[in-house]
């Protein structure tokens, strides 16, 4: 019976490694997305304020 069941320790280690990789991947992507979003928001805000100023004159 124990031959069919995979050893617990390597499976556990693999799961921990997988979760670490996923967490790191998600963290990197969210950081990049946040930075780009902030940059884009600043750009849009700047262009929008300039546009509204041009039209108010």
Curated annotation (Swiss-Prot):
Keyword Membrane: yes
Keywords: Host cell membrane, Host membrane, Host-virus interaction, Inhibition of host NF-kappa-B by virus, Membrane, Transmembrane, Transmembrane helix, Virion
Membrane-traversing stretches: 9-29
Residue spans, topological domain Intravirion: 30-57
Domain of life: Viruses
Main subcellular location of this protein, as a coarse class: virion
Gene Ontology cellular component annotations, sorted alphabetically: host cell plasma membrane; membrane; virion membrane
Membrane topology: Single-pass membrane protein
Residue numbers on the Virion surface membrane side: 1-8
GO BP annotation list: symbiont-mediated suppression of host NF-kappaB cascade
Cross-referenced Pfam families: SH
Stored InterPro entries: SH
Signal sequence interval, chain numbering: none
Subcellular location(s) of the protein: Virion membrane; Host cell membrane
Family named by the database record: Belongs to the rubulavirus small hydrophobic protein family.
Oligomer and partners: Interacts with host TNFRSF1A, RIPK1 and IRAK1; these interactions interfere with host NF-kappa-B activation at the level of receptor complexes. Interacts with host protein UBQLN4.
Functional summary from the UniProt entry: Plays a role in the inhibition of the host NF-kappa-B pathway. This inhibition occurs at the receptor level, by preventing the signaling of TNFR1 as well as IL-1R and TLR3.
Stated name of the protein: Small hydrophobic protein
Annotated source species: Mumps virus genotype B (strain Miyahara vaccine)
Name of the gene this protein is made from: SH
């Amino acid at each position: 019976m124990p031959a069919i069941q995979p050893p617990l320790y390597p499976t556990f280690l693999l799961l921990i490694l997988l979760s670490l990789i996923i967490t790191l991947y998600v963290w990197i992507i969210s950081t990049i997305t946040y930075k780009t979003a902030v940059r884009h928001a600043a750009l849009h805000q700047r262009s929008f304020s300039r546009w509204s100023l041009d039209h108010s004159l």
